[in-house]
């Protein structure tokens, strides 16, 4: 469960290292975000000499959460950390590589570009 003020790792090579969630998109007073949800975040740590800088406000899609994700067939997926992929206004990733396994639910939510870049789909 991701809520405002939650710190996230970045799972791509966009140039950001750490994010902090400041808003969850989708409803006016939505409290938590799960895998596949879009959040507004601020960059807390960035790689030098890249397009993204510290304290820049961006959009990101959640790809890993510590909270368990239960599927309809009974399988439970749980990751060790909270992570996101930086996206642009159209929903395409800003990075060209993704470093972690991605849940199958992202394909159903039309993040097909992120799924195609991922090394493994769980």
Curated annotation (Swiss-Prot):
Subcellular location: Plastid, Chloroplast
CDD domains reported for this sequence: Ribosomal_uL14
UniProt KW keywords: Chloroplast, Plastid, Ribonucleoprotein, Ribosomal protein, RNA-binding, rRNA-binding
One GO process term, biological-process aspect: translation
InterPro entries linked: Ribosomal_uL14, Ribosomal_uL14_bac-type, Ribosomal_uL14_CS, Ribosomal_uL14_sf
Pfam family, one: Ribosomal_L14
Source superkingdom: Eukaryota
GO cellular component, one term: chloroplast
Family matches, as SMART domains: Ribosomal_L14
GO molecular function, one term: large ribosomal subunit rRNA binding
Family: Belongs to the universal ribosomal protein uL14 family.
Job of this protein: Binds to 23S rRNA.
Subunit-structure text: Part of the 50S ribosomal subunit.
The name this protein goes by in its record: Large ribosomal subunit protein uL14c
Organism: Phaseolus vulgaris (Kidney bean)
């Amino acid at each position: 469960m991701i809520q405002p003020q939650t710190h996230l790792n970045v799972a791509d090579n966009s140039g950001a290292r750490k994010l902090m969630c400041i808003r969850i998109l989708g409803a006016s007073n939505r409290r938590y975000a799960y895998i596949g949800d879009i959040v507004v975040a601020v960059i807390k740590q960035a790689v030098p000499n890249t397009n993204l800088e510290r304290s820049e406000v961006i959009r990101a899609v959640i790809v890993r959460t510590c909270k368990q994700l239960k599927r309809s067939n009974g399988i439970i997926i749980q990751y060790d950390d909270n992570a996101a992929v930086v996206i642009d206004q159209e929903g395409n990733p800003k990075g060209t590589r993704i470093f972690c396994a991605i849940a199958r639910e992202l394909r159903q939510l039309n993040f097909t570009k992120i799924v195609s870049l991922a090394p493994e789909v769980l």
